[in-house]
C-alpha cells in the first residue's frame, strides 16, 4: 500500500487509507498527554496542530462508510482489511501466509501475489480475475486507476 500511495501522490491524487485492525490496537504513543488521558478514562481525545489532527474515540463499531466521510476531499480511499465489506477488492495472497482467496468472489477485482504459476493455478478463484505480481505496484496502481476513473 505504501508504494501505491507514492505512485498516486506522484500523479497528483489525494488518497486516504482506512485500515481495519482485527485486534485492539494502541492508538497513541505511551507517555503522551493524550495516551495518559485515554488510560485515565477519557472516552475520546483529539490532538491537532496547524497542519493535521488525530482523533481517538472509544466506540463499539464504526463502518468503513462512516470512516470515509472523514475524507470528503480525497480523490481515492483505499481500504486495508475489511475482507467482508461490500467494496471491490484486490486481495493479497502471500506464499506461506494464505493458500486461498477469502474474499467474496463477486467483489474480487484482482489478486496480488508472490505465488508461482503452479500455485496460482491451484487457487479456486474466478477465471476472469487478473493476477498481479505482489511487488509490481505500478501495474496494480494503473489497474486501480483504470477501474476507478472509468
Task: Set out the residue ranges of the language-model regions.
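Phosphate/Mg2+-binding loops and adjacent switch elements
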Residues: 76-133, 137-149
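Conserved active-site and cofactor/substrate-binding residues in soluble primary-metabolism enzymes
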Residues: 3, 32, 62, 135, ...
Amino acid at each position: 500500500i505504501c508504494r501505491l500511495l507514492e505512485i498516486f501522490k506522484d500523479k497528483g491524487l489525494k488518497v486516504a487509507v482506512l485500515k481495519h485492525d482485527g485486534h485492539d490496537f494502541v492508538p497513541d504513543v505511551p507517555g503522551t498527554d493524550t495516551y495518559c488521558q485515554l488510560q485515565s478514562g477519557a472516552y475520546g481525545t483529539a490532538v491537532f496542530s496547524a497542519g493535521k489532527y488525530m482523533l481517538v474515540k472509544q466506540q463499539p463499531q464504526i463502518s468503513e462508510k462512516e470512516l470515509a466521510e472523514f475524507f470528503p476531499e480525497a480523490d481515492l480511499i483505499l481500504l486495508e482489511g475489511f475482507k467482508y465489506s461490500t467494496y471491490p477488492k484486490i486481495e493479497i495472497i502471500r506464499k506461506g501466509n494464505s493458500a486461498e482467496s477469502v474474499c467474496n468472489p463477486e467483489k474480487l477485482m484482482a489478486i496480488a501475489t508472490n505465488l508461482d504459476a503452479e500455485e496460482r493455478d491451484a487457487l479456486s478463484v474466478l477465471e476472469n480475475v487478473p493476477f498481479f505480481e505482489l511487488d509490481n505496484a505500478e501495474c496494480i496502481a494503473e489497474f486501480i486507476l483504470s477501474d476507478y476513473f472509468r
